[in-house]
Amino acid sequence: MDKAEAHKILTEQLARFTDHAQLVPLVESQHIENCEVFGASGTRYQVEVQFFWDDAPMRAIRVVASIDDGGVRAFIPLTETLFVSPHEHTTA
């Protein structure tokens, strides 16, 4: 798996989830977003995004995205986390 390409895809996917008000229903319903994305190299990646309260309900939301190419990385996917507060967001 091309880590740079996978990281770019994760960054693009996380950018879709920065509005706290829109994320609240996803956390409350325990929604998991799954999709397949093709990288510039033609590699097919599986992306999973999960949503959690970070510390307490109605406060910061932790958005966790993971990616793999179906190979060995499927057992240990590349993962990135975004924290979205009601007023701002940060990436870890």
Please give the residue ranges for each predicted region:
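Flexible, low-complexity segments enriched in proline/glycine/serine and punctuated by aromatic residues
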Residues: 1-92
